[in-house]
């Protein structure tokens, strides 16, 4: 299943919030600005290095590609 950058960003944000992280946490760990993280989570930035942060913090790739994110961010 192919998802849009916007949907990918929304799922990453949902995962981040569910885990209790803030955009400032992602920014500090990746070296990117909060504005870059916000752009990623709204689909305006497709930086794969930012995406790696979510995987490094436990998000499973399956969550990005399942239909409608039906299992939620806990998978």
Regions found by a protein language model. Give the residues of each.
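Conserved hydrophobic/aromatic packing and binding residues within compact polymer-binding modules
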Residues: 12, 26-27, 37-40, 64
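The alpha-helix within a helix-turn-helix
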Residues: 16, 27, 54-55
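Short amphipathic recognition helices of helix-turn-helix/homeodomain-type DNA-binding modules
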Residues: 64-75
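A short, Lys/Arg-rich alpha-helix, primarily the initiator
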Residues: 1-18
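Helix-turn-helix DNA-binding elements, focusing on the entry/boundary residues of the two helices
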Residues: 12, 23, 34, 51
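DNA major-groove recognition helix of helix-turn-helix/homeodomain DNA-binding modules
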Residues: 46-65
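Recognition helix of helix-turn-helix/homeodomain-like DNA-binding domains
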Residues: 31-46
């Amino acid at each position: 299943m192919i998802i849009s950058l916007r949907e990918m960003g929304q799922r990453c944000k949902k995962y981040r919030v569910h885990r209790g992280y803030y955009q400032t946490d992602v920014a500090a760990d990746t070296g990117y600005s909060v504005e870059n993280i916000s752009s990623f989570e709204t689909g305006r930035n497709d930086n794969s290095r930012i995406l790696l942060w979510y995987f490094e913090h436990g998000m499973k790739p399956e969550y990005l590609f399942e239909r409608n994110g039906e299992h939620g961010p806990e998978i």
